[in-house]
């Protein structure tokens, strides 16, 4: 059974391992933990204001993540959307459940617009966001409060 819950400190190592494995080994993204200090300090980076970091688990195994940064001005940024390869697809619906929880939390907390950045090579993710009502936008149309990641090439927006 898949459960989704807010981040707890004991999950840190499992989250880091999941995300780095997907980034480096599955998609050959040239990024290290040193460039993602947010993963070593999740509570202070994500769990303030109306932001949060959710973890999907199968039993005790971390199999997915999603994070919301509260940027102020009724703007939220989606980060760290990852699902372990063996748990992807409609059979599990983990990515959809994670996004639904994030959007529900955003609406409850008066966040009106969501933004995210991703990589061109992550075509399944791009299709997922488009199916969920996100619109591709130019980098220069991002709000000034959007936290840019150097590796991102595609940017999306959704009014909720």
Feature locations, PLM:
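Extreme N-terminal starter segment of soluble prokaryotic enzymes
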Residues: 1-3
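Acetyl-CoA-dependent GNAT
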Residues: 6-86, 96-101, 105, 142, ...
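Glycine-rich phosphate-binding loop
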Residues: 91-93
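Terminal helix-turn-helix DNA-binding modules in bacterial transcription factors
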Residues: 108
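C-terminal "cap" of GNAT-fold acetyltransferases
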Residues: 112-115, 119-123, 127, 131-160
């Amino acid at each position: 059974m898949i459960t989704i819950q807010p981040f707890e400190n004991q999950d840190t190592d499992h989250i880091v391992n999941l995300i780095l494995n997907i980034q480096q080994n599955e998609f050959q993204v040239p990024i290290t933990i040193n460039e993602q200090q947010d993963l070593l300090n999740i509570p202070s980076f994500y769990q303030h204001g109306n932001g949060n970091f959710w973890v999907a688990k199968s039993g005790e195994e971390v199999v997915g993540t999603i994070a919301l940064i509260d940027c102020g001005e009724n703007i939220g940024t989606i980060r760290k959307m990852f699902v372990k390869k063996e748990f992807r697809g409609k059979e599990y619906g983990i990515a959809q459940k994670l996004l639904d929880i994030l959007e529900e939390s955003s609406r409850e907390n008066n966040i009106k617009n969501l933004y995210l950045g991703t990589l061109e090579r992550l075509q399944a993710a791009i299709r997922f966001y488009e199916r969920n009502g996100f619109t591709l936008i130019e980098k220069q149309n991002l709000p000034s409060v959007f936290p840019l990641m150097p590796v991102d090439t595609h940017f999306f927006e959704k009014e909720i």
